[in-house]
């Protein structure tokens, strides 16, 4: 056959399977089954954009660079087979009914059962606090008191004195650096926390965005880019700001701080998830709601990651009344930084504004008490495992 003659004349092969562990395994298994001995090179793509595909063909990699990736996938396959086939058969025989055992599934199930047992056995404990409303304009709280009689006695003493002594006012400037770029796990956590999407839903959405050339490769465990990508990211953030119409709206969208996103040592198979330049020409309103929301998260995180830190002044007030110490904490924003990006880009996703107390300027002195109240509370049980917690613990994306 002519086609067979053409095959025999081929001296080397290129394989473009999914650029990840399982894609590597699929090609190697097929290659081994064919008995082919020809040399082969790897086409490794992090984006489906035409420019990225052309660059990939221009920079084909020797297959030997991905031998460790293939071996890792092969170990995963063999481990799943050994544990799943053998243990499922063993426990099905022991219990007289079909019982599936999995290398990942069974430990996760055990972890969940232990947590649910702890929740079921939890007995809530009451506690009490005394709250003082001061004329300075803030509310100070006592420590937690387990005995109601002791709390009521403290309340009575405070109401009798109606004067507190401010012992200490500590002010400290603090800052929060921007979050890193998204890897798959952090994207899934945010999508679950903010949008209620399951980890699988988020993966489906971002995979579809990748296939539509709107985002880069989704199955990455890196939150960084390489030095080669830094110039690309700087240009992309400028275009994103212009695309969203926010660049001139606030000083927090200043020169992008891309250097903090660069760490070649922490980029394994793929860099962090980014929007592509093709996205800038796309009709985002035509996307399904889930895909549009996930894309908005990725755009916001890309801009947040290169923005200024969030700076604020934290004030801790310590006051004394009836021999008991009361405390109040407040916060004053100095520079909104990356939180301004989050607020503006995700305005329709963030369910509520961040609330905090601003304490007035105070000095160490006596302060009158306007009112004193007794508050009752209960200790909380451990939290049920959620998609967010499962992603945080790495049990969804690192099988």
Where in the sequence are the language-model features?
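Toprim catalytic domain recognition across nucleic-acid enzymes
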Residues: 1-399
């Amino acid at each position: 056959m002519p086609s067979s003659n053409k095959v025999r004349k081929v001296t080397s092969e290129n394989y473009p399977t999914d650029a990840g562990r399982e894609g590597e395994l699929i090609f190697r298994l097929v290659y081994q089954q064919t008995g082919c001995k020809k040399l082969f090179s790897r086409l490794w793509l992090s984006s489906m954009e035409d420019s990225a595909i052309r660059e990939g063909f221009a920079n084909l990699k020797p297959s030997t660079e991905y031998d460790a990736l293939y071996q890792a996938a092969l170990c995963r396959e063999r481990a799943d087979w050994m544990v799943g086939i053998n243990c499922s058969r063993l426990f099905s025989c022991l219990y007289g009914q079909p019982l599936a055992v999995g290398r990942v599934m069974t430990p996760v199930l055990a972890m969940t059962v232990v947590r649910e047992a702890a929740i079921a056995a939890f007995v809530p404990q009451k506690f009490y606090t005394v709250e003082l409303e001061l004329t300075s304009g803030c509310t100070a709280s006592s420590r937690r008191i387990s005995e109601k009689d002791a709390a009521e006695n403290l309340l009575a003493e405070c109401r009798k004195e109606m004067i507190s002594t401010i012992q200490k006012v500590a002010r400290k400037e603090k800052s929060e650096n921007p979050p890193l770029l998204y890897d798959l796990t952090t994207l899934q956590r945010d999508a679950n926390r903010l949008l209620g999407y399951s980890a699988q839903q988020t993966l489906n959405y971002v995979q579809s965005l990748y296939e539509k050339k709107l985002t880069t490769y989704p199955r990455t465990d890196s939150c960084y880019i390489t030095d080669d990508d830094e110039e690309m990211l700087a240009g992309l953030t400028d275009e994103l700001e212009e695309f969203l119409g926010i660049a001139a709206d606030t000083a927090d969208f200043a020169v992008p701080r891309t250097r903090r996103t660069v760490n070649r040592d922490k980029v394994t198979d793929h860099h962090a998830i980014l929007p592509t330049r093709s996205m800038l020409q796309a009709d985002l309103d035509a996307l399904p709601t889930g895909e549009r929301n996930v894309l908005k998260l990725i755009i916001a995180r890309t801009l947040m990651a290169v923005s200024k830190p969030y700076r604020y002044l934290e004030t801790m007030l310590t006051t004394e009344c009836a021999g008991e110490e009361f405390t109040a904490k407040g916060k004053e924003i100095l520079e909104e930084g990356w939180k301004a990006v989050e607020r503006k880009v995700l305005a329709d996703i963030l369910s509520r504004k961040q609330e905090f107390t601003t304490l007035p300027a105070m000095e160490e002195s006596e302060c009158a008490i306007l009112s004193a109240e007794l508050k009752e509370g209960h200790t909380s049980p451990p939290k049920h495992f959620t998609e967010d917690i499962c992603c945080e613990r790495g049990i969804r994306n690192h099988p």
